[in-house]
Every structure is written in structure tokens, then in C-alpha cells.
């Protein structure tokens, strides 16, 4: 990374590098469904390119996405009625409920021959609500339906990539996506994202005019190579992150119960969400978060938490000590609610 930065200072930081070839080959070798890769700067870029690729490949306009999902900041990826979003921005978006195959089939029947793609995260990662895993067999059914109707299946793996399975979250859930959007952990915080796909869509992707400022900077590409190499060299990177998450979530559930609370944890252990039951206005949850922050542990108020290879069991133990103190403090603030300080 340092060499990439120094070299870039001799000219401009945003310049092509042979490292991009190395990273593309590494991604193809790592992700089960990937046969090519192209790079951008953030998740929205990768998702937007995936949509354009699907439309170019199929000659169709409409996209299916799930209610409550999030796929970036570009207007055509948002939800109807969101502030700043015009009706025309989402005129070609069809919204269905997660885990509802009948709604998917009905949407396709209502727009037969007009649907370019279906886009989804590996499982639903709601804000202010529990995560929801795919029902047994759901992804295989979705894959079969998309194939039967010539619909491109796009997996938004921006946040879950390399956490569930180094080979891709579609591999983890037992299906193959046509296009996979990567980012998040790709370069361990450096600004780079990627779109990977099947050979059948390579020409369609190549036909799309798509670029951006700083997209070809060598340093983030070098960081991505270093990150993926580190993950691949680990004996079981995803297994380790799962173990850390399981220890943390089971500990939180147990400690909360000791104080009379009910901590609900959902999602996969390496990428989980928490909330307190019987707390519809999130007051107790916010108080718990605040007490943890005071003591040095930061939890996301209403969204997912990530585990990583840098975390140790000592970190988990310290976090649970803080959580215990935080629950005690919240219980003390509500003596009439039956909690145990």
C-alpha cells in the first residue's frame, strides 16, 4: 500500500495500475460465482453498475427489490416516498416482501418479459427491526424462478461479504448469483468496491459506460489484495468471526436475563442485530447503549454489528463486563419495572 501511495505521488493518485489485474484474479479465485471483476469506490457504485449491466443484458427496465431493503444512495435504488425521491426515480422498481415466493411469482406474472433483475442482500438486515434469515430452500427457489424467466439475480454482498463465507454469501446459502456486489470488508476500510459476475454478463457489463473520480487509485486496490490474502491465509476466518459473534450474542442474552431484560439477537453471529424485547419506543435500548458507551463499548443503536479477525475472546469478555454494568445501571434507573440491578 505504501509503495502504491509513493508511486502515485510522482504523478496523480488516481491512475490505473497492474494491481487491478491482480485483484481481479484474486477475486475470481476466491468468490465461487465470480468469473470477472470490475472496481468502483463504494457500494452504491457497484449496485448501480449491476443494475445497468442487467438492463443491458436483458433489454428490460424493471427491477425487483424487497420492502425494507437498502441498496445504496442512488435515487433508483431507494424506496418510493423517501424524502428527495421522485416517483419517476422508482417507476421501474417493483417491491415485494422477503421470504414470500408467491409475491415474487405474482410480480413476475404481472410484468412478464419486463423484469431485468432481482436484487437482494443474503438475508434481510432491517433497521429498527429484527434481521430475517431466508426460509429453508428460499434461495434455491428464487434462483430457479429467475433462471426460468431470464431475470438476472443480483446479490448485494456489500456488508456481508467475506463474513459468512470467503467464497461469497450465495455460496454460504447454497445458490449462485449472476452478479455479486462487494465492498465493506474488501479492503479493510480503504475506499473500494467491486462488481463480480458470470461470463454470460461480461459483454453486457463492458457495454455500459461507467467510471468515476478516483476509481483507479492503486492504494485501495493494494489494500484489498492484502486484506483478501490475510483472510485466505487464516485457518478459518469466517469460522473465527462466527465464534466471536456467538460468544458475544449468547453472553449478552444471558447477562440481560440476569437483570430481568430480554435481549433479542438476530441475523448471523458474525453480522448480528440486537434489541430489547418489550421496548417498542427503544427507550431502554438507547439507555443501555449509552451506558455501554460511557464504559468504553460501542454498540450500534438500531443496526447490525460486525465481528472481525482482530477481536479476541478477551475483547468479548471485557465487552460483556461492560454490558453487565450497563444493564445494572439501566435497571437502577427504572426501579418500578421489576428489573434487577
Regions found by a protein language model. Give the residues of each.
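Catalytic PLP-binding core of fold-type I/II PLP enzymes
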Residues: 131-164
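Conserved PLP-binding catalytic core of the aspartate aminotransferase-like
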Residues: 243-290, 310-311
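PLP-dependent aminotransferase class I/II
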Residues: 16-21, 188-191, 195, 208-232, ...
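PLP-dependent enzyme catalytic core of the Aspartate aminotransferase-like
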Residues: 232-233, 291-341
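PLP-dependent aspartate aminotransferase-fold enzymes
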Residues: 22-120, 124, 137, 246-249
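Active-site PLP attachment segment
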Residues: 12, 173-204, 216-223
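Structural signature of PLP-dependent enzymes
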Residues: 227-253
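Short, small-residue-biased leader/transition segments that mark boundaries at the very start
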Residues: 1-12
Amino acid at each position: 500500500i505504501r509503495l502504491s501511495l509513493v508511486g502515485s505521488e510522482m504523478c496523480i493518485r488516481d491512475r490505473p495500475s497492474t494491481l487491478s489485474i491482480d485483484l481481479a484474479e484474486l477475486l475470481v479465485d476466491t468468490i465461487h460465482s465470480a468469473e470477472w471483476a470490475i472496481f468502483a469506490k463504494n457500494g452504491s457504485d457497484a449496485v448501480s453498475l449491476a443494475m445497468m449491466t442487467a438492463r443491458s443484458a436483458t433489454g428490460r427496465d424493471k427491477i425487483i427489490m424487497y420492502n425494507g431493503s437498502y441498496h445504496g444512495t442512488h435515487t433508483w435504488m431507494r424506496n418510493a416516498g423517501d424524502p428527495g425521491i421522485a416517483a419517476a426515480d422508482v417507476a421501474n422498481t417493483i417491491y415485494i416482501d422477503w421470504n414470500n415466493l408467491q409475491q415474487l411469482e405474482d410480480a413476475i406474472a404481472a410484468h412478464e418479459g419486463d423484469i431485468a433483475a432481482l436484487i437482494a442482500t443474503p438475508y434481510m438486515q432491517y433497521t429498527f427491526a429484527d434481521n430475517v434469515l431466508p426460509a429453508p430452500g428460499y434461495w434455491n427457489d428464487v434462483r430457479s424462478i429467475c433462471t426460468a424467466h431470464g431475470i438476472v439475480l443480483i446479490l448485494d454482498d456489500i456488508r456481508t461479504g467475506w463474513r459468512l463465507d470467503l467464497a461469497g454469501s450465495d455460496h454460504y446459502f447454497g445458490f449462485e448469483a449472476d452478479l455479486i456486489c462487494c465492498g465493506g470488508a474488501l479492503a479493510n476500510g480503504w475506499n473500494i468496491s467491486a462488481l463480480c459476475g458470470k461470463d454470460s454478463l461480461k459483454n453486457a457489463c463492458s457495454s455500459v459506460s461507467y467510471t468515476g473520480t478516483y476509481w483507479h487509485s492503486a492504494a485501495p486496490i493494494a489494500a484489498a489484495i492484502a486484506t483478501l490474502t490475510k483472510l485466505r491465509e487464516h485457518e478459518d476466518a469466517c469460522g473465527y468471526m462466527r465464534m466471536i459473534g456467538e460468544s458475544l450474542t449468547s453472553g449478552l442474552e444471558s447477562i440481560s436475563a440476569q437483570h430481568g431484560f430480554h435481549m433479542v439477537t438476530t441475523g448471523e453471529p458474525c453480522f448480528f442485530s440486537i434489541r430489547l424485547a418489550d421496548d417498542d419506543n427503544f427507550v431502554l435500548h438507547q439507555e443501555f447503549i449509552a451506558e455501554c458507551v460511557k464504559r468504553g463499548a460501542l454498540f450500534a443503536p438500531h443496526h447490525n454489528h460486525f465481528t472481525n479477525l482482530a477481536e479476541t475472546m478477551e475483547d468479548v469478555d471485557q465487552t460483556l463486563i461492560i454490558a453487565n454494568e450497563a444493564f445494572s445501571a439501566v435497571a437502577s434507573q427504572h426501579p418500578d419495572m421489576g428489573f434487577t440491578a
